[in-house]
Amino acid sequence: MASEGDPGVGSGDSDFVVVANRLPIDMERLPDGSTSFKRSPGGLVTALEPLLRKRHGAWIGWAGIPDSAEDPIEDDGLQLYPVSLSADDVADYYEGFSNATLWPLYHDLIVKPIYHRKWWDRYVEVNRRFAEATARAAAEGATVWVQDYQLQLVPKMLRMLRPDLTIGFFLHIPFPPVELFMQMPWRTEIIEGLLGADLVGFHLPGGAQNFLYLARRLTGANTSRATVGVRSRFGEVQVGFRTVKVGAFPISIDSDELDGKARNRAVRQRAREIRNELGNPRKILLGVDRLDYTKGINVRLEALSELLEDGRVDSHDTVFVQLATPSRERVQSYIEMREDIERQVGHINGEFGDVGHPIVHYLHRPIPRDELIAFFVAADVMLVTPLRDGMNLVAKEYVACRSDLGGALVLSEFTGAAAELRQAYLANPHHLEGVKDAIEAALNQDPEEGRRRMRALRRQVLAHDVDRWARAFLDALADTRAGAKPVRD
């Protein structure tokens, strides 16, 4: 064990520690210089909150504003440990390496990744700070769960500081094909960073298989050759005397909560009001996305434009609502993408709309949760058309909100969700005619066929919720090390 004062000292009392880029709070700096915060909703914190409470748990992460204090925060019984990031850290580690290098590389090079040594150096430095904060907070023999692409070096760094810990890592975005990942100048360092964990989890078996191959190729480690299955049949990598398990764990949503909220009388009344406000169209198409170039918003707009032009969709009884949450607004590729999307919206409304009757209703702002659920209830067709997406929880949220068995889901084949939601209208977003055909089929589906499809989709989503995902991962993590404490509430 490290000496007194070293980051490796296990002085903390938390038996279960979650490490993520962001804390589960939204913090803002007030005019007088002080700060305030509120809890940010999310499936991850919902799933893990009971475990965090039961096990004296802690959450390590950035509070969301530069140069915030690192004083621990207690929020309704949860212990939060902020990691302070400077404006330069945010620019280089987060906006730079995480979102201009890793994000496009892991999403099939939709936008060209940028490789800067300065960004990489800052990524290493910030990951080390997260590892040191975790080492201080974790009790002897604790379980640590590291989340996502911003922190891929933390497992190895933490292993060096605290070999007594049981460490899991889960990647929430796709893991790229081997030939794409090999472009990364620091490819070996990232693979070795992840191999510091006892369990490395991905959404789909394909990502796990890619990782196993790269571990073998880049580190020379012995790996299992068997096919990885969903929540079963784990791959293995031998790292010295340790065996690292590699598995597939498709993430999900709090489907029971959404199902209950969508049945609420006020929400259903709001859904009727939305239809009235849109002019009581025969069909409402809906898109709900963070404004990101991976989401394929431009694809659905182009498909709709051509369907209107071909007369396959009637402009007088169909509207499309696109809810786009602002994202990464200082990054040039996102600025250009927003301009392109707004240009497409203007073209469609100018070409096919009438005064007082636009075809596309485009909202570029955050939408309150209950309002979003009302949109899900109101929409006849949900359009989820990413060019690449690790899972896409919006597709599952829409299904969870349709207890009436109404509606239809058009879903990109290049989402992780497509592997589970087979009764959706699946489409290749790179094939515009295929997207158009899927939208047309969803708009004109036979009502009984629609109910059959939605019933099957709901069975899948309600049975495989976020709690089941978290338990599957944590049970597998506890099995990796003899004597590890099981994480149970």
From Swiss-Prot:
Q: Which GO terms describe its molecular function?
A: alpha,alpha-trehalose-phosphate synthase (GDP-forming) activity; alpha,alpha-trehalose-phosphate synthase (UDP-forming) activity; trehalose-phosphatase activity
Under Enzyme Commission nomenclature, its number is 2.4.1.15, 2.4.1.347
Record's InterPro entries? Glyco_trans_20
Q: Name one GO biological process term.
A: trehalose biosynthetic process
Q: Which Pfam families has this protein been placed in?
A: Glyco_transf_20
Which reaction is this enzyme known to catalyze?
ADP-alpha-D-glucose + D-glucose 6-phosphate = alpha,alpha-trehalose 6-phosphate + ADP + H(+); CDP-alpha-D-glucose + D-glucose 6-phosphate = alpha,alpha-trehalose 6-phosphate + CDP + H(+); GDP-alpha-D-glucose + D-glucose 6-phosphate = alpha,alpha-trehalose 6-phosphate + GDP + H(+); TDP-alpha-D-glucose + D-glucose 6-phosphate = 5-methyl-UDP + alpha,alpha-trehalose 6-phosphate + H(+)
Q: For D-glucose 6-phosphate, which residues are the binding ones? A: 22, 94, 148, 328
SUPFAM superfamilies in the record = UDP-Glycosyltransferase/glycogen phosphorylase
Which pathway is this protein engaged in? Glycan biosynthesis; trehalose biosynthesis
Sites annotated Involved in alpha anomer selectivity = 103, 173
* GO cellular component terms, semicolon-separated: cytosol
According to the record's subunit comment, the protein's assembly and interactions are: Homotetramer.
- Which family does the UniProt entry place this protein in? Belongs to the glycosyltransferase 20 family.
What role does it play?
Probably involved in the osmoprotection via the biosynthesis of trehalose and in the production of glycogen and alpha-glucan via the TreS-Pep2 branch involved in the biosynthesis of maltose-1-phosphate (M1P). Catalyzes the transfer of glucose from UDP-glucose (UDP-Glc) to D-glucose 6-phosphate (Glc-6-P) to form trehalose-6-phosphate. Probably also able to use ADP-Glc, CDP-Glc, GDP-Glc and TDP-Glc as glucosyl donors.
Query: What is this protein's record name?
Result: Trehalose-6-phosphate synthase
Q: Which organism is it from?
A: Mycobacterium sp. (strain KMS)
